[in-house]
């Protein structure tokens, strides 16, 4: 009688016809429907490109669904990404294999979540938060991958320095706990190496690192060469390589953010590093176009420009802890005004620009200090530190303006005291800005080195300093 009622319910709701029952495992199908006689299942009707279209089930945007292959040998998880009239548009988390018209779709009636806890430290996870080595990890809670940012009025004001152990950043572009900084650079200028230095040298309690759309060979290189055992011990790595489906690459960024949110809620100071925000946006472009969104600027659909602030605003201060966000942005063709770069720069609390020209001079890290800014620095450092940083930037700007004249021998020493002082100090400035990847400095030592360079500045101002010819 129960089986007859279920079959009647299925036929009445036009989900799976009685004569289609031979194409699936009836026992499996009945076990799904016995949970609730009124739960509608869906049926796949079309697969085009990245999307699967189905009639039913009842679902909401971002709901997690499970799709069963026709012979019931495989299960595929997918997410609701849109609707076509009354039909449901799904995007799979894995390669579509064995799924075809008539495959059953079950709504899990919950969004994607990630398991969290201290047991995930030191491990590498995939885009959905599963350990890549198949090991069983100890979890204490689950956090939703999609979450709202903290209420603006609940955020603590950024007031404390987060030392990152890189002199050029700590000295001239000081980052505060809860700040969000973009690292803007073209390809091959040293973004990943700089992230590795931050991860090893930072004073943050926890590192959460997301590698989005990276080459497969670079993942192990980053773990063993850039991060090292010291950095990995207090880190969680979330990896979605370039061959993964767009939805996985998109979710990996949000999974890493959810993990960082968990540790922030435990009162920790978290450093969230994402490489790269550009590839997250590219994944969202694939999802948006596959869902039928129109392309606008440079082929990016509107959802790209709405998803980016949703992701970035989740970082920052809360009333419990902090997430300091470092997001690399791959600058297309070294054009710093292209849409993704421009949008990210407008949302973030500052940016660090890496210069290909400096890299070609073997000046690493290749940070162009004069093109970079930390919008929170003036609020978190003392007056003397701010003054010394300003003097160094002034020396660099003065030297850059006169560099061509100096190089061709057209500048006559003594004709401009500011240029003379810049020439006198430029070697010390460059030495301060350059740093080996295995070098580590305390914040107090960095500030002391910065002050020592300009210990004679007052003598220069009053004219008593004798500059070397």
Identify the function of each model-found stretch.
Residues 32, 74-77, 112-116, 131-137, ...:
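Active-site phosphate-binding and catalytic loops of NTP-dependent enzymes
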